[in-house]
Amino acid sequence: MEAHLANETKHALWHNDHTKGLLHVVIPNAGLIAAGIDPALLILKKPGQRFKVEVQTRYHATGQCEPWCQVFAAYIPDNALTNLLIPKTEPFVSHVFSATHNSGGLILSLPVYLSPGLFFDAFNVVAIRINTGNRKHRDICIMYAELIPNGTRYFADGQRVLLLCKQLIAYIRCTPRLASSIKIYAEHMVAAMGESHTSNGDNIGPVSSIIDLDRQLTSGGIDDSPAETRIQENNRDVLELIKRAVNIVNSRHPVRPSSSRVASGLLQSAKGHGAQTSNTDPINNGSFDGVLEPPGQGRFTGKKNNSSASIPPLQDVLLFTPASTEPQSLMEWFDICYAQLVSGDTPADFWKRRPLSIVPRHYAESPSPLIVVSYNGSSAWGGRITGSPILYHSAQAIIDAACINARVDNPQSLHVTARQELVARLPFLANVLNNQTPLPAFKPGAEMFLNQVFKQACVTSLTQGLITELQTNPTLQQLMEYDIADSSQTVIDEIVARTPDLIQTIVSVLTEMSMDAFYNSSLMYAVLAYLSSVYTRPQGGGYIPYLHASFPCWLGNRSIYLFDYYNSGGEILKLSKVPVPVALEKVGIGNSTQLRGKFIRSADIVDIGICSKYLPGQCYAYICLGFNQQLQSILVLPGGFAACFCITDTLQAALPASLIGPILDRFCFSIPNPHK
């Protein structure tokens, strides 16, 4: 919960308007695993070890997106919901509260971009990137429609708060060596609950009901749903607490009868002045500046001569009494009892002792739902700091109504007048309703479409470049500098005989490359290094590749290549988990020129496995494919036999120009224009 508090504090300091909201979420371990993220990498085992979580909002259909921004995040390996819903008591006391076991998860907060009226575009996407330092890349992408619930579930949390009180009372009654004041506070809690407990705690014993956190997620519905407005049997004790709280408030300041009349509103004022005359003591006229009406001449008073009593001095009309400092309600006694037991209190623990809302939300990329959390004192989505929950509204209902009235299936098919009316009400639709959007509009798979187009353009340019080179120069030369021993001649002869099949298989493997394989391939890293070096942002400035593995290629000259390693025997599979940087230097051998390889080592690059022990072509077990910043490519077979080709022209032909900006905005950091 501390991560949620930190993000909310940061949000309150940076944003004082209503154009950017905040959503507190928990991504369980199952959701992290589904995204290809190993939760073990988030466990900080060494001093200085850390992970970084960044988020980005990607706008509907336009390809535009916000810059990546870092958010506070915390990973709880086990019992993440317990961390959010159960107040901490360690290290002072232990085993006070008990709850069922639950999964670990990542706790973070996500920004939500809104238009006036707290409306959001349901097709906006928030991307979550978790950087663990192992260089593997994968974003978690969730649409606003999947992320933002329709309402809160505070009503379903009432039983948890009641059980916390019962568990605290049970612990205090069963623990003899506690301060007498704590035991007195516990008995006040019992009295406030209105239950008749015996002195030895027959009804509240050491084995009280355990809080079922799984039931918290599944029982009950949205607070405002008609089904939940009916009072159910298991919630009657909560309602009874509310009634008793009202009685306590009334007992604190009871209505006292008085012989003098006290005005309480215009109607009561009229009744009070009905039997009075205007023959009164002098009254300070300054007291009437503002909204008060002259005595005896109000809109609801009688005539001046219809009564004989005098009007009491104006200063006696309002009566102020000092507020009682002694706790009265169950929650107040709960607070003071808890703080005394654990020797203090924190904002996080205070929020845990008040009703919470936890709403599971399913999204396409994971079979396990994430959890949206709202706090009673929060200003983020669902928070009740202003009294009622702060809710954001989807604009899709307004758009659907316009389409139904116009009898069209696609909002982009609306008449110009209807589109202008929508834009006037929802300004963020100005670019979306344009038929020339680079990404599909009103389609949930727009982000996947962009990634698929990017991957397909890269793979197509690579395979076409390789095939063209082999058709032009079918004989492979030994371009890498290696001395082949006589004992290895048999292996070389076998490789030569298998070369056509190997190349055909490599082309098939590249063509059928999955998105996960593409995300961690030297092909994508090199293409991003090339695009970020030659393209600038429309508003000025440039790009830096996000992934550190691209830096040797992006910063280096044409001699720095990023290589992927494939096995040369049996079924050809990609072996290297991350690209291997190698510097290729030209050397003269007699009348010919060959390439000499050297590994590029970096302190921030983790061990890249056995592939880093052999340079391209040095081991008969590997086929290597590499690219430099200018997309000059080289396919190296065992023994150093290689084919060189360039894919720059084919990439520019295969990748639509309108998608280059959106691709770089997603996979690179933006550099602002230094002249602005």
Swiss-Prot record:
InterPro entries: UL17-like (IPR007640)
Domain of life from the UniProt record: Viruses
Main localization (coarse): virion
Bias kind Polar residues: ranges: 275-287
UniProt keywords, alphabetically: Capsid protein, Host nucleus, Late protein, Viral genome packaging, Viral release from host cell, Virion
Subcellular location(s) of the protein: Virion; Host nucleus
The keyword DNA damage is assigned to this record: no
Keyword Nucleotide-binding found: no
Biological process according to GO: chromosome organization
GO CC term, one of those recorded: viral capsid
Region (Disordered): 253-308
Bias-annotated ranges (Low complexity): 253-264
Disulfide pattern: none
Family label: Belongs to the herpesviridae CVC1 protein family.
Entry function: Capsid vertex-specific component that plays a role during viral DNA encapsidation, assuring correct genome cleavage and presumably stabilizing capsids that contain full-length viral genomes.
Name the UniProt record assigns to this protein: Capsid vertex component 1
